[in-house]
């Protein structure tokens, strides 16, 4: 008799694991999630080394720990381990290898590591730089680099970065920089693709301007730029037919406090504690999902990954997903037995 598959829960990883900022990809029949690494009872963001988890595309409740794929001390700027590894992203280069892009918490340049397999041990590869060897982020015209998101098409890799806090008029918006086939050298100079809150007036992004967490996907001939907005708890998207220009605001994909959802509460009532958010979309089989994170343990620094199935209209509009306890399960959890309290997705509070 064939054994019954495990139910897929939210958070989708074991209760003791804290992988926020999840970037999901499907490689060779498995879903791999790359993210930063928080700790239980953490006191800052991203205290751990990069680890990876994966699951079969047809068994999304069966996650496997792939181990440490990149220790923080591997970067030459961080041999003493004093800096944290912030949110990463991964892309497959023209040579078929896997490239990991990241920024250290007290650096402003983009580091790159490489591996022959999706979840092997990545080795430091270099820093993104221009044709004169000057690092992106070190040049006078550069804004500090943060939260890299990457997409490779042919010999070009599109690198998206940026952080725009409210009131900081030195930051413009989300940036895109085109890299050459070596995955490090700038081929086309940086352009701004989505405005931050200080530059959003009259753009259509007002109220949902770029804050951080840029991520890029392609659906058909349309580029979907996923990002955390100025209100932090929501992941929004913008769309364009070009990877480096013409993005227009699309809407909210998910809020980690379910703001705007009115099916079971008033739309302006939060269903949980909302705070920063980071993630992206992925197609698994015939369906698309949004991976995001929520906050636990009464702190900002112990975040856990969740995922929800998406409804996408024929014209490419992503409808906001409601947060659940069973996002990857294909339906509700079985209504029998006991479930741990940490799966609860709605925690209403009277302040």
Q: What is each PLM-predicted segment?
A:
Residues 1-351:
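Carbohydrate-active catalytic/glycan-binding domains of CAZyme proteins
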